[in-house]
């Protein structure tokens, strides 16, 4: 590069030198002597005068040539200096320091009413909470129950206590009078979630009821799955609950296992502010959780759920009068082994990868009749698949194997693409529709 620059400078210097001298010669030839105008007649008729004029021009030209030689010398010196200069490399660009985004603040919204046993819920949350700044606890109280209010107030600044202001009765259809509690719950949820997302302006929230106890890695679980929820539009929630999470139906040696499910589990669940903006304008007057399970709300989206639940319920008292608790909820196993989820690669839960691998695993497993699964025949097969072909066969096989047999808008509890996976007598079983399955039938209720 320097050689090209030097050659260019020499060429331009030579051109300028020749052109300048030609112009000077023409100028001196036509210029009159200093102090007197030229006489044309004198020059034409007097040889001596002509000789003197030529001598004068030659002297002037000699002086100018000296000046040009000096100019040419300066050009040469400049070129020599340029050639002798050692090129220096540009200073290396400073490496860009990666900016680690600040961790998201995810509040825990505790929905409370008239259970003073909310202390058990709050004690566990505060015991396992890794950071008060990253996981503020907001207790939203309905019902106006003073003993519960005092229990919440006793935690001081460790929690934020807000109160649902509308404690009035709700007008309900005559055949729904016994369900007024469900109407009040839906009203409370709407108000409390509105406070979290519109008043406090948090980007996400984990909703728990006041009768839930959390696992040691409850916060770690939601911290790790929050980025996945934000990044994958095919997901709309993360739940801490496995509807089929009874102790004999989970693999206790694999607490790190997570799944996608088309069924909305609730009972400790993470949602984003964007989802609340979608749901709030059409929030139902009652039975909000079953409303969430309808296809109009789910829109083909899934939730993440664990193999072993990160919450358990201890509240027999409630609007369901304890029946569901006695039959099912009290048997759900709560995880006790801390899993460092934030150190795990959870990309396998993204829809494309999950569907490919999960379906290959399920339909690659040998098919076995439900009777042989129940009697633990063909143990050498290991993981197996039990195939159902309709609503009635699903319910019959589910009851025979001990899994939840109810359906909401055609979706089985913990199901994904119609498949319910669980442990039975020490081996993995997939209760699955045919491979040609085309979607849920909302009439299966």
Swiss-Prot record:
Main location (coarse class): Golgi
Pathway where this protein functions: Protein modification; protein glycosylation
Cofactor(s) needed for function: Mn(2+)
Record Pfam families: GNT-I
Cofactor comment text: The cofactor is mostly bound to the substrate.
Any single biological process term in GO: UDP-N-acetylglucosamine catabolic process
Residue sites binding substrate per the record: 115, 142, 188, 210, 320
The keyword Glycoprotein is assigned to this record: no
Record's keyword terms, sorted: Cytoplasm, Disulfide bond, Glycosyltransferase, Golgi apparatus, Manganese, Membrane, Metal-binding, Signal-anchor, Transferase, Transmembrane, Transmembrane helix
Job description of the protein: Initiates complex N-linked carbohydrate formation. Essential for the conversion of high-mannose to hybrid and complex N-glycans.
PANTHER family: ALPHA-1,3-MANNOSYL-GLYCOPROTEIN 2-BETA-N-ACETYLGLUCOSAMINYLTRANSFERASE (PTHR10468:SF0), PROTEIN O-LINKED-MANNOSE BETA-1,2-N-ACETYLGLUCOSAMINYLTRANSFERASE 1/ALPHA-1,3-MANNOSYL-GLYCOPROTEIN 2-BETA-N-ACETYLGLUCOSAMINYLTRANSFERASE (PTHR10468)
UniProt family annotation: Belongs to the glycosyltransferase 13 family.
Name listed for the protein in its UniProt record: Alpha-1,3-mannosyl-glycoprotein 2-beta-N-acetylglucosaminyltransferase
Lineage: Eukaryota, Metazoa, Chordata, Craniata, Vertebrata
């Amino acid at each position: 590069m320097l050689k090209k620059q030097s050659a260019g400078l020499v060429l331009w210097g030579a051109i300028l030198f020749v052109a300048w001298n030609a112009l000077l010669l023409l100028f001196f030839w036509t210029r009159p002597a200093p102090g007197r105008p030229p006489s044309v007649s004198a020059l034409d008729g007097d040889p001596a005068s002509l000789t003197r004029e030529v001598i004068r021009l030659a002297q002037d030209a000699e002086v100018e040539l000296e000046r040009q030689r000096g100019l040419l010398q300066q050009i040469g010196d400049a070129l020599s200096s340029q050639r002798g200069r050692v090129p220096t490399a540009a200073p290396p660009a400073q490496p860009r320091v990666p900016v680690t985004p600040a961790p998201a603040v995810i509040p825990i919204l505790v929905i409370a009413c008239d259970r003073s046993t909310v202390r058990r819920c709050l004690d566990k949350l505060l015991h396992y909470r890794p950071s008060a700044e990253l996981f503020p606890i907001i207790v939203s109280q309905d019902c106006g129950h003073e003993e519960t209010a005092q229990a919440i107030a006793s935690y001081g600044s460790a929690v934020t206590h807000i109160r649902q202001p509308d404690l009035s009765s709700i007008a309900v259809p005559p055949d729904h009078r016994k369900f007024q509690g469900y109407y009040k719950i839906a009203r409370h949820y709407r108000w409390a979630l509105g406070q979290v997302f519109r008043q406090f302006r948090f980007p996400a929230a984990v909703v728990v009821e006041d009768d839930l106890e959390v696992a040691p890695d409850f916060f770690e679980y939601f911290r790790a799955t929050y980025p996945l929820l934000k990044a994958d539009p095919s997901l709309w929630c993360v739940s801490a609950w496995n509807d089929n999470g009874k102790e004999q139906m989970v693999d206790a040696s694999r607490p790190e296992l997570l799944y996608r499910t088309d069924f909305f589990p609730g009972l400790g669940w993470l949602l984003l502010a964007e989802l609340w903006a979608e749901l709030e304008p059409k929030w139902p007057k009652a039975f909000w959780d079953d409303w969430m399970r309808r296809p109009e709300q789910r829109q083909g989206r899934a939730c993440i759920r664990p193999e072993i639940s990160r919450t358990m319920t201890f509240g027999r008292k409630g609007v369901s009068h304890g029946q569901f608790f006695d039959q099912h909820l009290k048997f759900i196993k709560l995880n006790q082994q801390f899993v460092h989820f934030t150190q795990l690669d959870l990309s396998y839960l993204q829809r494309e990868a999950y569907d490919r691998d999960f379906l290959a695993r399920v339909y690659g497993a040998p098919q076995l009749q439900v009777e042989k699964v129940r009697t633990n025949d063909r143990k050498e097969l290991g993981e197996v698949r039990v195939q159902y072909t309709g609503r009635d066969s699903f319910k019959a096989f589910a009851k025979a194997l001990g899994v939840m047999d109810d359906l909401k808008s055609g979706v089985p509890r913990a199901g994904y693409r119609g498949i319910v996976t669980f442990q039975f007598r020490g081996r993995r079983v997939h209760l699955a529709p045919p491979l040609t399955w085309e979607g849920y039938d909302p009439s299966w209720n």
